[in-house]
């Protein structure tokens, strides 16, 4: 008899019940690993699968996470370059792609990443045909559109991480300015995740008090408090971090876990995420942009109708036109 047999008395054969909350992260770069760790620390899955083409890096990351298994509630952490390891995932987070270089615009990355997606997306669909697909790779709005097209999934099951992080950055800076916790500072950044994002100044509030009623020039020229600079700091935030440490990881990882939590726990929370906005706010083309959306079990269930000022709507349409200009040139 083996030690195990002497130690453990078998009462019944275990039923092979699959994972109920399996999450896959594709890409074990800085963003992928920060997302994976954030998901594990929030205890959001009963199985985590990691996939990457770089086998040694993947193997090392999986082992490193497994060695911390004692401190986690997720008992199964697996990884492979073969997508069969991702089978029956509930949520698949795609962070893989060419990394943004210092000074490179997110739009410049596009075709490099489209080619990578042509391999990744069909493999995800093959093994997890019912999953919710969350795209994080940049430029996220265009790549969410690409993932939607390549997957053949209905629109509610393809979500881009969008401006969830931009809005968090905005609320953080707003909190610094007002000496308040970010959760008490309400403000939404919508549109493109990137240079043409739109701050909805008309909705910025603390405890229901509209800041624009207190300061009618807020966000406009001639504002003595220069709130416009807050949005500029949001846009420049990623570039600044990349310049200083070479990449961004922690905040986007936490943002991803925040979105995954709303899905797997069916929270019906509202997040600014990237979805198909054709027909909304005067957008005529098939583009994905961030608007406030409700996330739950089935993915993206509802979109909130924002009351935008004409100027804000104009910026959103301009954003959409920029993205469409790039999208129509893509070879899918």
From Swiss-Prot:
SUPFAM superfamilies: LDH C-terminal domain-like, NAD(P)-binding Rossmann-fold domains
EC top class named in words: oxidoreductase
GO terms of molecular function: L-lactate dehydrogenase activity
EC number from the UniProt entry: 1.1.1.27
InterPro entries the record matches: L-lactate/malate_DH, L-lactate_DH, L-lactate_DH_AS, Lactate/malate_DH_C, Lactate/malate_DH_N, Lactate_DH/Glyco_Ohase_4_C, NAD(P)-bd_dom_sf
Active site positions, chain numbering: 193
Residues noted as binding substrate in the record, renumbered to the chain: 106, 138, 169, 248
Keyword Membrane carried by entry: no
Pfam family membership, one: Ldh_1_C
GO terms, biological process: lactate metabolic process
Gene Ontology CC terms: cytoplasm
Chain positions recorded as NAD(+) binding sites: 29-57, 99, 138
Main location, first listed in the record: cytoplasm
Entry annotated with the keyword Cell inner membrane: no
Pathway assigned in UniProt: Fermentation; pyruvate fermentation to lactate; (S)-lactate from pyruvate: step 1/1
Assigned keywords, A-Z: Cytoplasm, NAD, Oxidoreductase
Catalysed reactions, semicolon-separated: (S)-lactate + NAD(+) = pyruvate + NADH + H(+)
Compartments, as annotated in UniProt: Cytoplasm
Recorded family membership: Belongs to the LDH/MDH superfamily. LDH family.
Subunit structure: Homotetramer.
Function: Interconverts simultaneously and stereospecifically pyruvate and lactate with concomitant interconversion of NADH and NAD(+).
Protein name as catalogued: L-lactate dehydrogenase A chain
Organism: Sphyraena lucasana
